[in-house]
């Protein structure tokens, strides 16, 4: 994600929260010029540490989202802060998205689920993936409320109208002033909504889609590569949703190449670095739901690729 911003954006600075010591060590060794690396020991406060034992690793990461934004705004006195998921990849400068919010204080990004796959009721209207808060009265009021709410309850389950850190955002357009919902379709492309759009072409870093509903073209700003997972024997799983082969070949394959380049870069500065991959087997898929998904993928042979074959077929991209 950092490298994609380097290619597409002249002016940015990332505040990267390293959630384990090894990540912090490697990120500091990389000497990223436009990034500040923040360790857990510097970031965690008493409230976060108090609830940490009651959350899984994933739930704790979700719990911390609002706190990371608040930390950056207060610690570094920045005028605004945009939270980014680490599995985003940018194809053009996100300034076009930030400009859209105008004088508003908060920018939200919808999931944009298609009707046949609408999980709004359980997962939320908005996706915590690209989320901006301005350091003003309206922005900080919402941010502090969100942090307190996530510390009180943030779990990987639907309960009483809540789910993780996301469902809390559902009523913000009426709860708070200065909230803008992103309209640019190029911001928020992901496996759960890309089937609504037809891939048209990719020229370098310029990716063009066609929106069937509005009968119009738009350029991708970023894509959310949710649930891309690597396994032993050069296997990559692209997730549960089923993107078309043009999307796989023009977005996923180049993304896999970029991840492998970054792995090699890390190995250059840390000879002992090794990713402990699992076998792509039924036993390594936790829970009944994931086991069923695994069986479907094996039987119907979709979304699971050999990385070498995938890259070889798209070496000219």
Question: What do the predicted segments below correspond to?
Answer:
Residues 1-317:
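Glycosyltransferase catalytic domains, chiefly GT-A lineage
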């Amino acid at each position: 994600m950092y490298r994609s911003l380097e290619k597409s954006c002249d002016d940015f600075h990332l505040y990267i929260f390293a959630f384990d010591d090894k990540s912090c060590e490697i990120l500091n060794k990389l000497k990223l010029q436009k990034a500040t690396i923040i360790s857990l020991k510097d970031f965690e406060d008493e409230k976060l540490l108090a609830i940490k034992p009651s959350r899984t690793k994933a739930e704790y990461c979700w719990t911390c989202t609002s706190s990371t934004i608040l930390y950056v705004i207060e610690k570094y006195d920045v005028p605004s802060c945009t939270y980014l998921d680490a599995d985003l990849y940018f194809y053009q400068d996100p300034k076009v998205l930030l400009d859209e919010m105008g004088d508003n204080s908060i920018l939200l990004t919808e999931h944009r689920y298609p009707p046949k796959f609408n999980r709004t009721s359980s997962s939320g209207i908005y996706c915590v993936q690209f989320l901006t808060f301005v350091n003003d009265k309206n922005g900080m009021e919402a941010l502090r409320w969100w942090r307190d709410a996530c510390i009180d309850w943030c779990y990987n389950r639907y309960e009483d109208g809540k789910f993780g850190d996301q469902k809390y955002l559902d009523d913000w357009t009426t709860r708070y002033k200065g909230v803008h919902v992103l309209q640019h379709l190029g911001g928020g492309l992901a496996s759960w909504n890309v089937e609504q759009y037809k891939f048209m072409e990719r020229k370098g870093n310029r990716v063009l889609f066609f929106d069937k509903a509005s009968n119009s073209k738009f350029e991708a700003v970023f894509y959310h590569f949710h649930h891309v997972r690597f396994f032993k024997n050069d296997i990559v799983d692209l997730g549960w949703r089923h993107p078309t082969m043009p999307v796989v070949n023009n977005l996923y394959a180049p993304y896999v190449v970029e991840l492998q380049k970054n792995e090699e870069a890390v190995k250059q500065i840390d000879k002992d670095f090794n990713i402990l991959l699992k076998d792509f087997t039924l036993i390594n898929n936790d829970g009944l739901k994931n086991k069923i998904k695994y069986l479907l993928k094996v039987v119907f042979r979709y979304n699971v690729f050999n990385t070498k074959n995938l890259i070889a077929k798209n070496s000219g991209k």
